[in-house]
Amino acid sequence: IRDRSPSRGLGDVYKRQHAGQVYINDGFNMVWMTPHEGIPASGLAQEDFRRDTNDDGSDGVRVRYLGAEYATRWGVDVSNHQGTIDWAALKRQGIDFAYLRLGLRGYGEKGSLYPDRSFDSYYSGARAAGIEVGVYFFSQAATVQEAAQEALYALQLLDGRDLDLPVYYDWEPVQQEDSRTLHNNEFLLTSQARTFCALIEQGGYEAGVYMNRQQGYYRYDLSSMGNIALWIADPGDYPDFYYRFDVWQYDHGARLDGVNEIVDLNVEFVPVM
């Protein structure tokens, strides 16, 4: 693992003070962290990545991995908010995969479950264009029982459809007074994710958890989540989440031909054996 700390050249005293720690961006600040034992580090560094440049010299939309440890693929994640999508146009631009929102739970006290209205058309269009498909479920579960309910609802919505990629549990905090999930702690959130993923796997699909850096460091207990796939939201030109992950969401506001609205962009990492 390459050393990301500022201690190089700062003397033995400084190094001893932070022995066994790594210097990371937690999404808020640069901080020292003692890594969990038994969780592999990503080993990725800034020099492993390069953003494409447009003909006019401006930044392109694609970020490429230059290293040799992984093969990478380029993808989008979309929901009904993106409207009508020309999937063939996305394929022509090099999109390899898409994560489609399958359904969601509402923010308010009732917390009703809903399908994504565009899922069926997106699924058909993406597969017809030769784009591999995975899905995510937007969770607002406030209990383990509700996470189980969401998993069973997701399986009902999938109705046996073939997927190329995992079903991801996408729990996100909602900062408003009537949010039903304001008090979800680390233990509860981790238990919810594990329950959701276990039921999805029992249904015959791969499962994973979507999270940002703050959640990965402070809200989920990654040491108890086994080999569950991780999808990390870490916007920028290179990923600096310390632990190993499977998918990197690097842009929340890209423009691509074939999509009228802005779209999220992702890189999938496939280890080279």
List the predicted regions and their residue ranges:
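Single conserved hydrophobic/aromatic residue that forms the stacking wall/gate
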Residues: 1-14
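Hydrophobic anchor at the start of a short beta-strand
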Residues: 133, 206-208, 230
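Short beta-strand/turn micro-motifs composed of small residues
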Residues: 137, 211, 234
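Accessory recognition modules or surfaces
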Residues: 165-172, 216-233
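Aromatic-lined carbohydrate-recognition surfaces of secreted/lumenal glycan-active proteins
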Residues: 204-218
